Amino acid sequence: MLLDAGPQYPAIGVTTFGSSRHHSAADVTDREVGLGINPFADGMGAFKLNPGGHELASAGQTAFTSQAPGYAAALGHHHHPPHVGSYSSAAFNSTRDFLFRNRGFGEAAAASAQHSLFASAAGGFGGPHGHGDAAGHILFPGLHEQAAGHASPNVVNGQMRLGFSGDMYGRAEQYGQVTSPRSEHYASSQLHGYGHMNMNMAAHHGAGAFFRYMRQPIKQELICKWIEPEQLANPKKSCNKTFSTMHELVTHVTVEHVGGPEQSNHICFWEECPREGKPFKAKYKLVNHIRVHTGEKPFPCPFPGCGKVFARSENLKIHKRTHTGEKPFKCEFEGCDRRFANSSDRKKHMHVHTSDKPYLCKMCDKSYTHPSSLRKHMKVHESSSQGSQPSPAASSGYESSTPPTIVSPSTENQTASSLSPSSSAGHHTASHSTLTSNFNEWYV
């Protein structure tokens, strides 16, 4: 399979190894050698990713043939380490000498080369400095925390596969003397923004790095305020045992205080209970009542995203109808098709048909069939008490609902002409107050 890589990429040291081009020294001098390792990088050319069977025989040879002759020629007037010249005797081979030499997975890959694009593995370069067994030096270091003996699935015969890591490429150990800690620090800082590109990087920190910054749960202490009957004498002494979870508190109250079926009196002895010793008819009613004191709500809404919890299963059953849209309670009045989700809403609605007005205003003699109407009426009293002292008719809020008499313009003009300016202004003010009061009564 052939891969046409397209344009020239001298910055990452990729060259057209298989091409038969020849370059003069003048052409080489014009190139900007600082962009890459190989100054002859005209383009990526054709990469043969799957070597043939006859190519596997040369697996013992060098996997990456250096282009040092051109490198040395291009660096003619520059200062460079003397070991660079050791590569001048290497032959100019094709792309297959650069890429994979074996289909099997090698285990000689160094751990520091697992996250680079072109990383030389152990024994890849033999040099005069005795680094034949050294690992490739990574120009852009990634996460290199794995053990050296652990084989990476991206290593093929000591060479890193042309992968999709976030790091760019690796240099041989012999080139390591050219770099400096300052340049490596700069490269690491510049590569920090490419973290999202690296699809082969393992999550070394795990979930701990995230949970470290989560808010720690506040430890709550739940106190039992049950008072035993034999300790009701002054001063009263409550249980005062503390618990860290609601389950422990509820279990303690149920087992130690409420008791089993042998208990005949189902009385709540919680501290400052408003029932004041009034018994329940059944044990389950006492258990449900104790949830008012403990705050237990063991019935959560099963619908996702709701998050509401309830102390009684009956309340949960009614609440679920808001999600399902079920309205099983139909109005019993003939000809009315209104339906309701619970019986209490239906009972409030029935007052419309029976003309019952059980909701009385405590400030006046008005009564209404629905509590919402009473709440609207109470706003009339609130607004009148907050404002300036208006006329008695406007402050009462329950005057006659008869609309005011419509006055013709001629009559109004005659009345205005017969009054003095001051009395005329007072007359208009009183009329306006009466209209406002009556309109408020209409909206109630």
Swiss-Prot record:
Originating gene: ZIC1
Which Gene Ontology cellular component annotation is one that this UniProt entry carries?
Answer: nucleus
Where composition is biased (Low complexity), the residues are 383-432
**UniProt xrefs under Gene3D superfamilies:** Classic Zinc Finger (3.30.160.60)
Q: Where are the zinc fingers (C2H2-type)?
A: 222-257, 271-293, 299-323, 329-353, 359-381
Specify the protein name: Zinc finger protein ZIC 1
- Record carries keyword S-adenosyl-L-methionine: no
Q: Name one GO molecular function term.
A: DNA-binding transcription factor activity, RNA polymerase II-specific
List the residue ranges of the region (Disordered): 372-432
Q: Where in the cell is it found?
A: Nucleus; Cytoplasm
Example GO BP: spinal cord development
Function recorded in the entry? Acts as a transcriptional activator. Involved in neurogenesis. Plays important roles in the early stage of organogenesis of the CNS, as well as during dorsal spinal cord development and maturation of the cerebellum. Binds to the minimal GLI-consensus sequence 5'-TGGGTGGTC-3'.
